[in-house]
Amino acid sequence: MTFYLGIDVSSKTLDVAFFRAGEHTGACEQFDNSPAGAKKLLRIMARLDVQHVVLEATGGYENLILDAMAQIYTVTRIASHRGTAFVRSLGKFAKTDKADARALAHMAQTITPQPYKPPTPAQRHLRGLVKGRDQLIRQRDDNRRRIKRCESMVVQGALERVDALLTAEIKALEGLMAEAAKAADAPLAEQLLQVPGLGKIAVATLLAFLPELGQRGNRQISALVGVAPYTKQSGRRDGPRQIMAGRPFVRRILYMAALAAIRSTQSPLRAHYQALKERGKPPKVAIVACMRKLLITLNAMVRDQTPWHG
């Protein structure tokens, strides 16, 4: 008998729903979110014909069981808003861990599998560095806002020393990121560094959080990053197209890269941006269009293994 599994992940537990093919109800069991709990779940799964597993991204709490299962089973990790939307589409509004697991098992029977591919150790290390740098930059930004509002010279001096420390740590992480990017994929890192607007930080972020670069179509890669325009039409109203969702780390770095490319005389994005402005596009819309064009160019470069031509 074929089974479909839905897993609701928390920091301490895994609630797992087991649905037989064609059924929309089934048993639900709880396991510890630990190596021992993962082994226990895998022993049970080994006795079943598991066709598809769906779980939500939960900020990293899912990584243990995800990495353990992805080597053996077809596992799809979805964004949490997709799970919420699916539950509401079923007309269910109760919120429990078991109910969420059952909804995900139902979803496993419905959606086309998008098999999760675990990152390599080098990619995982690089992701940690990119996330750590981002956290320190946010802390430094908060600290600098406090400095501007500070009423005590003593406290201001203390905050300025904290600022200097954070800046030094950020610089150190950036050096480690450049080294880790080369360790993850040196040829690809060198290829991307040829592109005007892409520096070492941007390249490291792309290697860490967009391993699909060069492996997906232009529409797919645009949707993954969150720069694909979606139509907003209802009745007689035809609203402006909007971007949504995607991968924030990659989208932020693409925004900065597009701005740098627009200012560069060596980049064709400068002319593309000016042409969009002349057609009456708002500046932000023109920048997002340049982000998408830059991403599609990078996707083609990696797919075809061609250098930057300008």
Each PLM stretch: what is its role?
Residues 1-164, 263, 285:
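Phosphate- and other anionic-substrate recognition elements at nucleic-acid/protein interfaces
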Residues 107-108, 126, 192, 206, ...:
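Short alpha-helical scaffolding segments that buttress acidic/His motifs in well-ordered protein cores
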Residues 136, 166, 192-193, 216, ...:
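A short amphipathic alpha-helix within small helical-bundle interaction modules
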Residues 144-201, 210, 262-265:
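Helix-hairpin-helix/helix-loop-helix acidic hairpins
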Residues 200, 206-279, 283:
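Phosphate-backbone recognition surface of nucleic-acid-processing proteins
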Residues 264-310:
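Acidic, carboxylate-rich catalytic segments that either coordinate divalent cations
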